[in-house]
């Protein structure tokens, strides 16, 4: 299972593919990959 866009996270691996964890806001956002 993975965290979707704007879901809470602690690290990049928590997030779904093509999403990364924003360290300041602690949510998953697009990491720029396709």
UniProtKB/Swiss-Prot annotation:
This is Kappa-theraphotoxin-Sc1a. Transmembrane segments: none annotated. Acts as a gating-modifier to inhibit voltage-gated potassium channels. It inhibits delayed Kv2.1/KCNB1 (IC(50) is 12.7 nM), Kv2.1/Kv9.3 (IC(50) is 7.2 nM) (KCNB1/KCNS3), Kv2.2/KCNB2 (IC(50) is 21.4 nM), and transient Kv4.2/KCND2 (IC(50) is 1.2 nM) channels. One of its GO terms (molecular function) is ion channel inhibitor activity. Negative results: does not have effect on Kv4.1/KCND1 and Kv4.3/KCND3. Intracerebroventricular injection into mice does not induce observable neurotoxicity symptoms. The keyword Disulfide bond applies. It is found in: Secreted. One of its GO terms (cellular component) is extracellular region. It comes from Stromatopelma calceatum. The presence of a 'disulfide through disulfide knot' structurally defines this protein as a knottin. It holds the Pfam family Toxin_12. Expressed by the venom gland. The modification Isoleucine amide is found at residue 34. Its main location: secreted. InterPro entries: Huwentoxin-1. Belongs to the neurotoxin 10 (Hwtx-1) family. 57 (ScTx1) subfamily. Disulfide bonds join 2-16, 9-21, 15-28. Coiled coil: none annotated. Keywords: Amidation, Disulfide bond, Ion channel impairing toxin, Knottin, Neurotoxin, Potassium channel impairing toxin, Secreted, Toxin, Voltage-gated potassium channel impairing toxin. It comes from the Eukaryota. The keyword Transferase does not apply.
